[in-house]
Every structure is written in structure tokens, then in C-alpha cells.
Amino acid sequence: LTYYKILLKQKNKLTTYKKLVDLLLKIQKIKPKTKIKNIINGTHEIKKYSSKQLHRETDLFFDWYLPLFLNKKKILKIKKKTKKILSQLYKNLNFPNSYFVHRDYHSQNLMKVGNRVGVIDSQDALIGNPTYDLVSLIDDVRLRTSKKLKKQIYDYYLKKINKIYRVNSQK
């Protein structure tokens, strides 16, 4: 049973989201390794988030969304200008980039397993910014959430992460 189906039926979703945020924070506390063992070929390399990866993700906008509204010539013109601006922005990004990032941490990849939460579909994971997965959870396109609920989830995450950082900085 996915948390998507659970959340669809719930009126008060905050308690469930808190449980999912708690698991996310546990995952984020794990020191990521760039190479992990797997059963198929021995090891798998988890890459770091990079400008190249960010460009691949923004390309989705040009490849999938804009063709619904514009011709190829206009898309190429917009893409060229936008890529130039984005390249500058990506160079100036300065955020913590040393966390395990699932990259698909949303309700359909979170399973109810007894009283625990199971996480599936992690083959696209990277080492990157911890907020990526939080945004995937809060802004899940499959579920409508109010601004109020999004803020409550975000505030809960901040409160919990601030406690973690305070504890870690005192060690």
C-alpha cells in the first residue's frame, strides 16, 4: 500500500507527512558513500549533483513542456537564452551538497510496511542538497496540498533539522 493511497483518503494529512519527514531526516543523517555494493555487478557509483545534472533536469522543460505551445525555432531561441542565464545561476549556487538525495521521494514511492515506511525507486539517487527530497514530498504533483499544509510540513522539517544541526555542532 502506497502513502499516495493513504494520503488520498485522509482528511488530516499532517501526522502522516510528519512520519514521512522523520524518515527523510533519518535518511539524510546517513553519511553517503560514492560507491555502494549491489547484487548485480558488485558496486554502483552514486554521483554528486552537478551543473550538468541541473541542466539535464531543466532540459525537460524545453523537451516536454514547451513543444505543447511553441515551434522548434522559438524553443531553441528561448533555450539558448535561458541556458546562458541558468549557467550563471548554477555557478553561484552554494548549498550543502553532501547528502543522500533519493530524487523520487514522493508518496507513490513510499510504502506502508506494517508500522514502518518502505522506500522504493532509488536508482536515480545522487549526493546533493537535502531540500530536494523535501520539495518532492511537499509538492508532489499527484496530491493536492494546501499552502497551509505545505507550510506546516516545511516548518516541521526546519524545526527537526535545526535540532539535528544543534546536536551535531555540539559534538
PLM region descriptions:
Residues Q10-Y17, I75, K79, L143, ...:
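Flexible, glycine- and charge-enriched loops at secondary-structure boundaries
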Residues I27-Q28, L86-L134, V141-T145:
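Active-site acidic catalytic loop and adjacent metal/ATP-binding pocket
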Residues L1-R56, N94:
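ATP-binding pocket architecture of kinase catalytic cores
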Residues Q170-K171:
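Hydrophobic, secondary-structure "cap" segments at the distal end of domains
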Residues D59-F69, P130-R166:
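Active-site activation/catalytic loop segments of kinase-like enzymes and analogous catalytic loops
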Residues P32-K35, H44-E45, K52-Q53, E57-F100, ...:
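An alpha-helical support segment within catalytic cores of ATP-dependent transferases
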Residues P32-H44, S51-H55, H102, S107, ...:
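Glycan-recognition and catalytic cores of secretory/periplasmic carbohydrate-active enzymes
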Residues K19, L23, K81, I85, ...:
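Charged catalytic carboxylate motif
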